């Protein structure tokens, strides 16, 4: 009997413990449910925040797109204003007299330019002046059709250019030309290379200006011929270079010369008519240079011409 009571007491104790454990498990389960509910709430909040962030990101992208569009429009307006400003500067520095049709004048951003004139007396002529060119008291006259004149960037030029009957005149980069300069053409080409130094009152006459005939054949005998001045040539003051002449790179033409025959590269020529007085020379724009290496441009051309 005593044993049964003891077993019964033990069973009751175990049952009590099981109930306690069950109560604890229920409590834990309740806590887990609470945590799960909180996690779901947090997850919902995170999803809401993520949705808001996506909405904000979308709005920011839209704003960024609008800003880019506005920036593009502002750049376009700025470009137009610069173009208008360039045209106004060109109009301010050039007077244009167009007496034909199909004529074109393209002008870049000029430097310190004033009192220039362009006159078109014909059709389909073209004048192109590139950026950073300094034009002062320059007159360009087109006579007839299909003439072409181009002045490359970083050049400085004064004087008169007359292009006649399908002629072409090209002036290279960084070339400087003094006042009183004159180019006369007639169905021919005049080319001045890069880095040339042309003094005041220089005349390049590719045409005699008026025809001369043989009285027996009755045919013209003085047709115009091309003039070519290569890059890096120094032409002194009051020089006249006549039709058909070519002057080689690195050469110098002395004061007051009349050049009727070709001058090779790296030669000094002078006189009337000009003759070669010294070979194997090269000049420098820098007046203080004592060696070829003292002038970068001179050194560069010397290397090219002697390699």
From Swiss-Prot:
Residues 1-90 have a biased composition (Basic and acidic residues). Keywords: Repeat, Transferase. Residues 1-95 are annotated as: Disordered. Acetyl-CoA binds at residues 208-210, 237, 243, 261, 278. Belongs to the transferase hexapeptide repeat family. Polymeric sialic acid-containing capsule provides a means for the bacteria to evade the immune response during infection by mimicking host sialic acid-containing cell surface structures. O-acetylation of the sialic acid residues of capsular polysaccharides alters their immunogenicity and susceptibility to glycosidases. The catalytic efficiency increases linearly with the number of RLKTQDS repeats. Catalyzes the O-acetylation of capsular polymeric sialic acid. Shows high substrate specificity toward polymers of sialic acid that contains a large number of residues. This is Polysialic acid O-acetyltransferase. It comes from Escherichia coli O1:K1 / APEC.
């Amino acid at each position: 009997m005593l044993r049964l009571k003891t077993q019964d007491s033990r069973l009751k104790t175990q049952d009590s413990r099981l109930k306690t454990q069950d109560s604890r498990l229920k409590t834990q389960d309740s806590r887990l449910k609470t945590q799960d509910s909180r996690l779901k709430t947090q997850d919902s909040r995170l999803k809401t925040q993520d949705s808001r962030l996506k909405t904000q990101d979308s709005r920011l992208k839209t704003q960024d797109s609008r800003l880019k569009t506005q920036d593009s429009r502002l750049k376009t307006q700025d470009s137009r204003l610069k173009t208008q400003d360039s045209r106004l500067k060109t109009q301010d520095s050039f007077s244009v007299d167009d007496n034909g049709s199909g004529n074109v004048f393209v002008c870049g951003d000029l430097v310190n330019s004033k009192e220039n004139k362009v006159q078109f007396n014909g059709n389909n002529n073209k004048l192109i002046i590139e950026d950073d060119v300094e034009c002062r008291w320059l007159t360009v006259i087109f006579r007839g059709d299909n003439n072409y004149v181009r002045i490359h960037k970083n050049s400085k030029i004064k004087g008169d250019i007359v292009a006649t009957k399908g002629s072409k005149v090209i002036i290279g980069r960084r070339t400087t030309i003094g006042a009183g300069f004159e180019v006369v053409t007639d169905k021919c080409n005049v080319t001045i290379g890069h880095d040339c130094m042309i003094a005041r009152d220089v005349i390049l006459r590719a045409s005699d200006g008026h025809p001369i005939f043989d009285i027996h054949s009755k045919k013209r005998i003085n047709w115009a011929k091309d003039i070519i001045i290569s890059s890096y040539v120094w032409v002194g003051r009051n020089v006249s270079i006549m039709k058909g002449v070519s002057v080689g790179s690195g050469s110098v033409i002395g004061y007051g010369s009349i050049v009727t025959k070709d001058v090779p590269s790296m030669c000094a020529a002078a006189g009337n008519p000009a003759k070669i007085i010294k070979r194997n020379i090269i000049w420098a724009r820098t007046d203080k240079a004592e060696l070829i290496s003292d002038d970068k441009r001179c050194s560069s051309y010397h290397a090219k011409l002697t390699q």
